Amino acid sequence: MQYTEIMVRYGELSTKGHNKKSFIDRLGVNVRKALHSFDQVKVHAQRDRLHVELNGADYDQVMNRLKLVFGIQNFSPSIKVDKTFEATAEAAAQMIAEQVDKPITFKVETRRSDHQFAIDTFEMNNKLGGYLLDKFPDKLKVDVHHPDLTLRVEIRLNGIFLSSETIKGAGGLPVGTAGKGMMMMSGGIDSPVAAYLGMKRGVSMEMVHFFSPPYTSPQALAKAKQLTERLAKYSGSIKFIQVPFAEIQETVKEKVPEGYLMTIQRRMMLRLAAALMIKRHGLAIFNGESLGQVASQTMESMLAINDVTSYPVLRPVLSFDKTEIIKIAQDIDTYDLSILPYEDCCTVFTPPSPKTRPNVKRAREYEKRLDIEGLMQRALDGIEITEIHPGEDYLNQNEDVFAELL
């Protein structure tokens, strides 16, 4: 069956009151961005539904893109027919013939926005349901409460639209409706999941990745970019900000006691992330910390690290077990990349026994040994920004260096 359009139903947007229009407008922009490669597709974002006119585009390909767009509760492929009962009945019979191969229960559910149409919703439900029962007596039985199949009929000004399938969307809120966040992106399992969860709540993410050549390899940088590419399919594109961090790590290792290396390094990372957030008009910093998962992720450690900024530091996976984080990573296709064995700057210079309950005052005292302003300025002067789009391959750009490790 050649579908005419896809009817998209909103998720939480239906509860947004006076802000609903801005949320719907943003969702329309995001859907158009997700479907930009389909030249013939037209997107119409309306108050109660979003309609994607296929105009001959491949339904399966369009559907796979829509599944990744946050803010969509579900959607249904539909066909458009002339505004007559005869055309509606013929199309409905074709749908049943193609989709039903064993006895099932069903119901007809009609919405009518064109109140000039001669048949009202109650009459359409009864008349069309009776027609289908007569035509398929061995296949169909009515159940209005828990049917196996719901045949939806929408009577609009420009035609009648029929659908019988409902496909689950990504849920959440449209990316961009909650403002911009700076994600402290490592190459591990947790931070891509945290970024995904933040994006699902409407945050437009920019990735901040600290790299420390020669202590970290080109492979580690390429892996972080490829992880960002996996996440870009949820928002269209993501800016990746790489921050040189080797000088800071070397200086901290030289001047700070071993037990506080991790704490001071992370305080410097947070300072840099906050500086970038201000410069790039963000509203919050995100990271992948999970309470108690490793020695540096205690509440005392978080308190000592957060001391350097008054801006919000949000941790979407804070209360998740590792198994829960891994499950999400597998679902969003980042897990296999995350476990590739390339060290990032969070794992180099790691002391054997970091302080699990660092003292804030002591951390401040140790930092007096550092030229914090100079170190930060040189790091910020060396940043590089890459716009990462879905489908880009950063691993093959490093094929030679990867080959010896794979």
Swiss-Prot record:
Listed pathway(s): Cofactor biosynthesis; thiamine diphosphate biosynthesis
One annotated GO biological process: thiamine diphosphate biosynthetic process
PROSITE patterns in alphabetical order: THUMP
Transmembrane segments: none
Keyword Cell membrane belongs to the record: no
Primary location class: cytoplasm
Gene3D superfamilies: 3.30.2130.30, HUPs (3.40.50.620)
Binding site for ATP: M184, M185, H209, F210, R266, G288, Q297
CDD domains in the record: PPase_ThiI, THUMP_ThiI
Residue ranges annotated for the THUMP domain, each copy included: 60-166
GO cellular component, one term: cytosol
EC number: 2.8.1.4
Keyword Heme included in the entry's annotation: no
Subcellular location: Cytoplasm
Annotated family: Belongs to the ThiI family.
Protein name, as recorded: Probable tRNA sulfurtransferase
Organism of this sequence: Limosilactobacillus reuteri (strain DSM 20016)
